[in-house]
Amino acid sequence: MALIRKTFYFLFAVFFVLVQLPSECQAGLDFSQPFPSDEFAVCESCKLGRGKCRKECLENEKPDGNCRLNFLCCRERI
């Protein structure tokens, strides 16, 4: 009986650890690395690829929403 209880606790602990691991869906654009030119990959909230996520927009760009914390979606001025 004690062996069954220990096995149950072991499997429960393994399950708990596996649940804490991040899922594959979190490994997307939100965690992308910056490019050498200090630009980030295009965010989903950045109008379907028509802008770039940056801390500050360039002179020829205008802010058009937020990508994530402290980043703006910058689009070219028309």
UniProtKB/Swiss-Prot annotation:
One of its GO terms (biological process) is defense response to bacterium. It is found in: Secreted. Residues 1-27 form the signal peptide. It comes from the Eukaryota. InterPro entries: Beta_defensin_dom. Its main location: secreted. Disulfide bonds join C43-C74, C53-C67, C57-C73. The keyword Transmembrane does not apply. Pfam families: Defensin_beta_2. Keywords: Antibiotic, Antimicrobial, Defensin, Disulfide bond, Secreted, Signal. GO terms for cellular component: extracellular region. Belongs to the beta-defensin family. Has antimicrobial activity. This is Beta-defensin 105A. The lineage of its organism: Eukaryota, Metazoa, Chordata, Craniata, Vertebrata.
